[in-house]
Amino acid sequence: METATVLIVFIASLLLGVTGYSVYTAFGPNSKDLRDPFEDHED
């Protein structure tokens, strides 16, 4: 494999991993513990 191909595969897998982790954090079982700053703010 060429160096560019390995680099592209690494960056793509890293991006997919970060995206998957953020979706799991936002909608997973621990999402009930997250606070909403818009609801905390009073007008």
UniProtKB/Swiss-Prot annotation:
GO terms for cellular component: chloroplast thylakoid membrane. It is a single-pass membrane protein. Its main location: plastid. One of its GO terms (biological process) is photosynthesis. Keywords: Chloroplast, Membrane, Plastid, Thylakoid, Transmembrane, Transmembrane helix. The chain crosses the membrane at residues 7-27. Belongs to the PsbN family. NCBIfam families: PRK13183.1. PANTHER family: PROTEIN PSBN. This is Protein PsbN.
